[in-house]
């Protein structure tokens, strides 16, 4: 607080100097600067900023506006499309970042592929069993029909013989 009072007379002289100088705009479009350089400047100026309450500081009447820098937007990262089908692990490791998450994703995809293959094998096995069962039931039905026909013929034969004797 004492420092603020000590700089009070200097601020009066700087106020008269700012009145004669033309006002600079508070916003600068600095598209030529690098992103990292701009962040270093803002952090350096932020470290010198005194953290006191605004009402505790006397109004010096400097009318100094803060400088705002708009940084150049970052270029987007190119999107990569890849499939784990028909690729070896070396190519996949080149594309994915070196983290544990990429290994988990690869392992999870391989597990999903194994589960899918197991389900396909089980469904094929079930289809084969069902086709064998269908063939078996079809054959059984045909044999039952044939036995019925033979039994009816045998039963009807005795009746037919009796009717033939009666006609004669």
From Swiss-Prot:
Biased composition regions of type Basic and acidic residues, renumbered to the chain: 31-40
Disulphide bond pairs: none
Region annotation Disordered: where it falls in the sequence: 1-52
Composition-biased stretches (Polar residues): 10-23
Domain of life of the organism encoding this protein: Eukaryota
Name of the protein described by the UniProt record: Uncharacterized protein C5orf52 homolog
Taxonomic classification: Eukaryota, Metazoa, Chordata, Craniata, Vertebrata
């Amino acid at each position: 607080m004492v420092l603020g009072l000590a700089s009070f007379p200097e601020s009066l002289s700087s106020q008269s100097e700012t009145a004669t100088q033309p006002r600079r705009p508070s916003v600068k479009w600095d598209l030529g600067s690098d992103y990292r350089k701009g962040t270093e400047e803002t952090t350096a100026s932020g470290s010198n900023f005194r953290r006191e309450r605004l009402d505790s500081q006397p109004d010096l009447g400097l009318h100094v506006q803060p400088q705002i820098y708009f940084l150049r937007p970052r270029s987007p990262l190119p999107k990569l499309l890849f499939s784990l089908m028909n690729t070896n692990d070396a190519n996949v490791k080149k594309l994915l970042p070196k983290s544990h998450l990429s290994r988990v994703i690869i392992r999870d995809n391989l597990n999903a592929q194994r589960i899918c293959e197991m389900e396909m094998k089980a469904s094929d096995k079930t289809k084969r069993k069902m086709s064998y069962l269908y063939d078996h039931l079809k054959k059984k039905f045909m044999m039952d029909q044939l036995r019925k026909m033979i039994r009816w013929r045998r039963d009807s034969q005795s009746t037919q013989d009796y009717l033939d004797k009666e006609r004669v």
